[in-house]
């Protein structure tokens, strides 16, 4: 039994190592934001302001909007950093997202939650199904099992936070500051846009930096 367990662990380690090596060897990280201007980005909405200040994207608005990258992607690893403003604030990273005819965006969103609810790193379906993980209401058996303290405490409220999103096929994973917060399968959208959100709080400035992608 011990031999079988050792063999299994060796095979598993080999597969995981080979996967990481394969990704790094055959692919290349690409900066979606060059740190100087917003080349490659666009605002599909009729409202919302966006600027680059000292290598940081700053979003300002009095209504919710998303600043979207021009290219659609399917399987990838996305890494980015976000800093929420003080006070009431909420944001997110759209991925594999879609656009309606009026320009509004919808689809998968990695949640950035500035409230005491502490759902940062959850998976939200913006403009469509709503919460996928965790689930409403806040107190329920699913959340008790799948949204434990480590995930709740991963986000640093008044600091920069690192997000990692991995999509391959229907497998979706999200990390916040190195803590895996979402790991599930959903096949609703296989390809779409990357976008960053201002939630619409007047006078609030949302900041993003170090946005890069590795296509799988």
What residue spans do the PLM features occupy?
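Bacterial Sec-dependent N-terminal signal peptides
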Residues: 1-25
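Carbohydrate-interacting regions of secretory-pathway proteins
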Residues: 20-216
């Amino acid at each position: 039994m011990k031999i079988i367990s050792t063999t299994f662990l060796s095979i598993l380690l080999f597969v995981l190592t080979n996967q990481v090596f394969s990704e790094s060897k055959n692919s290349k990280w690409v900066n979606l934001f060059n740190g100087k201007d917003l080349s490659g980005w666009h605002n599909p909405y009729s409202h919302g302001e966006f600027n680059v200040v000292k290598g940081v994207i700053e979003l300002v608005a009095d209504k919710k909007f998303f600043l979207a990258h021009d290219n659609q992607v399917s399987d990838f690893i996305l890494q980015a950093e976000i800093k929420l403003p003080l006070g009431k604030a909420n944001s997110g990273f759209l991925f594999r997202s879609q656009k309606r005819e009026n320009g509004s965006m919808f689809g998968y969103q990695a949640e950035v939650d500035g409230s005491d609810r502490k759902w940062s790193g959850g998976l939200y379906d913006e403009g469509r199904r709503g919460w996928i993980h965790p689930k409403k209401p806040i107190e329920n058996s699913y959340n008790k099992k799948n949204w434990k303290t480590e995930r709740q405490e991963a986000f640093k409220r008044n600091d920069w936070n690192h997000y990692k999103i991995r999509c391959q096929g229907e497998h979706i994973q999200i990390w916040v500051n190195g803590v895996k917060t979402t790991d599930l399968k959903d096949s609703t959208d296989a390809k779409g846009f990357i976008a960053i959100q201002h939630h619409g709080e007047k006078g609030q400035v949302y900041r993003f930096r170090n946005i890069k992608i590795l296509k799988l």
